[in-house]
Amino acid sequence: MSYYYVPISSPYQIESTEYIDDFVTMLFDGSIEFINDEQRKQLKLPENYIQSVRENISLYSDRVPLYDIGSNHIFLIHRDNVYPRIYFENYRFIDQNFYNDLKNIKKPTSIDKNNLRILSHYDLSKLYTTYMKIFYDSFVVNSYITHCQRPSFFSGMEHIRPYYTINELNYLAYDWNLTNKLSLTTSEINSFCKKISQYDIPAETLLDHQMYIYDSKAIGLVKHYSLFGSYYMNYYLRKNKCCLPGEINDDMTIVRNLYLENQIEIMIRLIKNAPGFTKSHTVYRFVETDDYLKHLNIGDIYQDSSFMSTTRNPFYYKENYAFGYILIKITIPKKIKGTGLCIEAYSNFPNEEEIVLPPTTRYRLVNYMENQELENFQNVFGIVAKKKYEFEWVGNDYIDKADFEIKIDIPNSIIPKKNFVDLKELINDDNIKNLSISDRLKYFRDTYSSVNNQFVCQIGNYEYIFNFEAYNSTSVYKPFFYYEINDGIMVTTSNPKYGNINILMELGPEIHVNYYFRYSVTDPSIVVDLNRSEWIEWLSVFSYVIGSRNVVIHSNYVLQYDKSDTIKQKQMKTRYTFSQNIYLYLKNGTKFFEFDEVVPNFDYARLDYLFGYNVFDVIKPTDRDELYRITQSSGKSNMGDLYIYIIENHPKLIRSIEDKMDIVYNYNDNINPFKNISYNLDAWRYLYDHYYINHIPSEKEFTIKKGSFKKLIGSKKIVKFQNRLRTYLMSQ
């Protein structure tokens, strides 16, 4: 098609071009204008010629007009830059509303007039169609969409995206030595899809490791490790070198922590028996310092004294450590049992896609890069890594050992005596009686806990080791704790057989018990059954001793599947927990904590109400999830029966149906039982009613002095767990 125009400098001189790009550029620059209707007739062009030109330039997709609010200018933007301009620089598409507003400006500036001139040449409806096509294409070209499927996606885990981005394919192809080119075309990158898919960890491996963790009754241990257990375990291992006896300094006086060592041994056994990987894979780790690696030469072996948390997704860490750290790349072997454990199915941070390698693992250094060598790598992939170490897995000390042989042994160490405490005896301790309520916690910790911040109590038929630990719940850890506090103190105890936390008490004016379990699971062995009189008594006495007024006991959370379920159903059902307290009440009327001094913080009648509430008053065909279809096929007519059905058959949708309960309870959190399944134990009333005490202080006496917790926390006091990566992420 020929594009006829007249130069602005010679409006009666008709010229033409065959190139639409030249034509659009000149129109945009204001150096030419459309021919008028008389000139069209003179050239004997069709009546719709000018409109055809408008449509053609509006459908022209190589360059399109975008509006920049910062400068109030319309710019002609190349298609490859459309997505970055809109996403990163806040440029915007132009539509009829924008054009109308522009025309209606009462006192337009010269810029406004020029914008109006540019847009007068376009058919805005056609232009919008072009925008949509370009935006999608630009999105793809700018490395945000491909059709290359992740082999891990078919595990059904919700945090895994189905497709690689082009940036990921580009990075992995280069990093895995599939190409030596730093810059690849879209078609070249896509050609690496099958090769990259073969190297990545498949769904089969993730599912094997998931069911292995479940069958080992280790969900609670993995949850604990991923939250704060890894900090305490690795701090102990690195400090004492207890898994590498040959590196222990003879001059060191090591005070043993047998409780923590037991958790470490259980975790090592769990990894040692983990299924092997179907293929060789690459995992990554970012660290802040390489002091422990600097001495290595190519070919040297490094043996780690602690667990190593790695990721199969370099982009997770790459994006979050973009300010510059040290990258470690490790190649792990295929078909060797006990190499490492994929924990993402049960991790509290599944997006980390974490693979844990055990202590004593040996790594051979095969490559090292820093400074200038990394410059191209950094510029292309946006990694501001100071150094890059590449290792290959060699082995670990546990692979050929039997489980009973995995024991930590530290020669010439000190094993502190257990501090047995009968809390009931302390009720008559004059030192406690004469202390203010706010000073009791410090006195108890200083007087009755060991050097490891532990004390031991006999409750019922079991002996429990309790730990004082500290936390900061103001950042990434906020969801896992009831109290939002910089210097929080908690008391925990774990199952000696499985290593999981079976009670977690957040200390304060109220002791909050097991709030964390909504993100974990209640101890499956029922070693701790709080719904027993001996625990109600112990919690009440403990509140008295440390100066807390009440105890709030939160719901148990469990998971289940039927023996008749298929493997796929078991894999799905063992990922989702639910409130055991709600389920058992709705299922068969079971109530927890029916003690005089314990009051539920919800109304059971509100749960009964569900059995009279029609499902289709809540679940609608316009809902975006699967609930409507499943509700139709379930045959359930009321919300109570439907909730039970979802738990037993489709636990993936538990959170969805619980969100729907807002409709049932008119969006009133105060009456919605799903918002607060907990029970309030009036601890001091319990002691008063059972004649342990003869006086209950006034409420104003149950206060915590500002800074009193902080004084108890420190490296030589109650140790606070840290995770620098997650802390950094929350600060950004």
UniProtKB/Swiss-Prot annotation:
Source organism, top-level taxon: Viruses
One cellular component (GO) term of this entry: extracellular region
PROSITE patterns in alphabetical order: TR_MART
SUPFAM superfamilies: ADP-ribosylation
Gene3D superfamilies for this protein: Toxin ADP-ribosyltransferase, Chain A, domain 1
InterPro entries xrefs: ADP-ribosyltransferase (IPR003540)
The protein, known as: Uncharacterized protein R217
Source organism of the structure: Acanthamoeba polyphaga mimivirus
